[in-house]
Swiss-Prot record:
The modification N-acetylserine is found at residue 2. Pfam families: Skp1_POZ (PF03931). It comes from Saccharomyces cerevisiae (strain ATCC 204508 / S288c) (Baker's yeast). SUPFAM superfamilies: POZ domain. GO terms for cellular component: Cul3-RING ubiquitin ligase complex; cytoplasm; elongin complex; nucleotide-excision repair factor 4 complex. The keyword Acetylation applies. The gene is ELC1. GO terms for molecular function: protein-macromolecule adaptor activity. This is Elongin-C. The lineage of its organism: Eukaryota, Fungi, Dikarya, Ascomycota, Saccharomycotina.
Amino acid sequence: MSQDFVTLVSKDDKEYEISRSAAMISPTLKAMIEGPFRESKGRIELKQFDSHILEKAVEYLNYNLKYSGVSEDDDEIPEFEIPTEMSLELLLAADYLSI
């Protein structure tokens, strides 16, 4: 795998490839990638999250990367949709990932 990407693995063993730049938005993932951990090899197992939660977290990291330099007043930024039924689990994931 290219060093430009990181693979995140969910509790149910689904894999999500994410750009290293997007992953580095999360201080937690950044520490894993840059540290002496086996995760620094480009594969990070996040076994505390089901795939639908990890997928939404990856979506958010990509969204954040894409719109990070855009003014909040810009009408071009779409709202990031969070389904109500996922709110609590996403809050826990966001807390863990510090995003």
